[in-house]
């Protein structure tokens, strides 16, 4: 890079997570950021939760099919925890240790928003699961994409076409408004890690906001050589 230098420890990659409600545009923005980073010479690993590793993808199917909901909020949270444990051990940590940037579509903030704030799973239960599954691992940066609920649900419906909504898309409007509030609170509670991004506009304008946040938080400007 000609004009920026990475803020980083020796040898370790960077861990960036994308969060937000349904239809916020996370999948699009994570791909656009990956392309930008690769153009700057970075090695990038794209992944997602629930899922991201073979074992975790099995859990993803169980959760999004609605089977987890039948077991109750705490049992569903255990499914997420099992998936995350497999994902962290087999994908995220190895990639970071090799110096790659890991861009993850959802991580533990989604568990806190969906199962904690809305599913009413107690904070001490979530904290215990977090200690077991991720230990000291924490994203270097979390980008929370924010859109009005009606906009997000309309996008989600357009994306799936004639397909049936998944477990969370099928929830009522009150659920989704509560979800948006939960992500706002996460951003407010941890401003050093989280950046709330207005994702109402199209992909290109939003990608500029994403890149600005990455540059500001994970890179530092250096004087151009004269």
Curated annotation (Swiss-Prot):
Enzyme Commission identifier(s) = 2.7.4.9
Sorted alphabetically, which Pfam families does this protein's record hold? Thymidylate_kin (PF02223)
What does the record give as the reaction this protein catalyses? Answer: dTMP + ATP = dTDP + ADP
Q: Which GO terms describe its cellular component?
A: cytosol
User: Could you say which residues bind ATP here?
Assistant: 20-27
What is the main EC category here? transferase
Molecular function as annotated in GO:
ATP binding; dTMP kinase activity
Keyword Thylakoid annotated: no
Any one GO biological process: dTTP biosynthetic process
Name the keywords, alphabetized.
ATP-binding, Kinase, Nucleotide biosynthesis, Nucleotide-binding, Transferase
Please give the function described in this protein's UniProt entry. Answer: Phosphorylation of dTMP to form dTDP in both de novo and salvage pathways of dTTP synthesis.
Query: Family per UniProt?
Result: Belongs to the thymidylate kinase family.
The protein depicted here goes by the name Thymidylate kinase
Organism of provenance: Bradyrhizobium sp. (strain BTAi1 / ATCC BAA-1182)
Report the gene name.
Answer: tmk
